[in-house]
Amino acid sequence: MMILKMKKEDLPAFLESAKQWGELWGPTTKEEQTAYSKVDGLSQMDLKATRTMIPPKKFLYPPRFTMFDFDEEGFVERTGDVPKRILFGLHPCDIHGILIMDKLFLETYKDPYYAERREKTLLLGHSCIPDDKCMCFATNTDFVAEGFDLFFTDLKMFYLVWVGSSRGHDLVRMRADLFSRNLDKNDILNYTEYRKWKTAQFKAKIDLTGMPDIFELGYNSPVWDELAEKCLSCGQCSMVCPTCNCYNVVDEVELGTVEGTRDRFWDSCMFREYSVVAGGHNFRDKRADRLRLWYTHKLQAFIGEFGKPACVGCGRCVSTCPVDINVATVSKALKEQEVGK
């Protein structure tokens, strides 16, 4: 992988040139809430924001979209109408989240809708500063070595830029005059110090070692019922999680016609209706069962299948849950067999 150097003052010019490839999107903050928005340039972005409300998976796996239109003659797929986008400012944890989504939607059974959006999206990562909700140090997702086209590490006076794909190389070639391959001893020392400094910024103390065994041992623990007493089953944790991928499919038909659309939309195993089957039986009618399923999948089952948790430590569940149920509090409760008050 090639690593280049770029002066910070040259970033606006680079992004202006990159817009030849597609729409430019970046993190913007309004009324203390940060979201990805279409922007004209760097001046509209908030690169100091720790996290966006909704992860960037929404660009690859939209909250709702039409798969195809149908009538009595047949159906026509909705393809080719996805715009080309450049997402700038993605943090390491969110890129790790997209890598997990890639594994689920592009391997074994390739999802054509996800694949089209992934192909038409460039991922330009940016370094970040952890806050008291960040847990990526515990999930080993505080740095990233793949999954991006370019990654910009802010070393105060300049950027170190990792080129992660051929498309990233294409962007660099558009303004090759802004980049340098001449890295020296000081650049190495600065980057080493940056890594030490970032690691020291983590305030959330969370230890996820041994979680698969702890979940197995605690499968019938009363802790789940205690947590369920607090849980609202609102599903916010699923909506903001970078790796949640459950969906439902519904046909929308115009009254009095046989014309309609087949739509896919986000769903959540935290919803009571999620596990209802024909005849009205519900496999997970109890809130405790749904809560246990969600966390068992994140911190046990996914590790068993893929060797790493399906939590990337972004802290969105911490900042979103109104009753303080999140990866940190649940793992702590299981280890101590006591729900924090």
Outline where the language-model segments fall.
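Ferredoxin-type iron-sulfur electron-transfer modules in oxidoreductases and energy-metabolism complexes
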Residues: 208-229, 247-341
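Oxyanion-binding "anion nests"
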Residues: 206-214, 231-242
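Histidine- and/or cysteine-centered catalytic micro-motif in compact active-site loops
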Residues: 166, 236, 242-249, 274
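Short, well-structured alpha-helical interface segments that form or flank functional binding sites
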Residues: 88, 222, 226-232, 236-239
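Iron-sulfur-associated redox domains of electron-transfer enzymes in respiratory
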Residues: 1-214
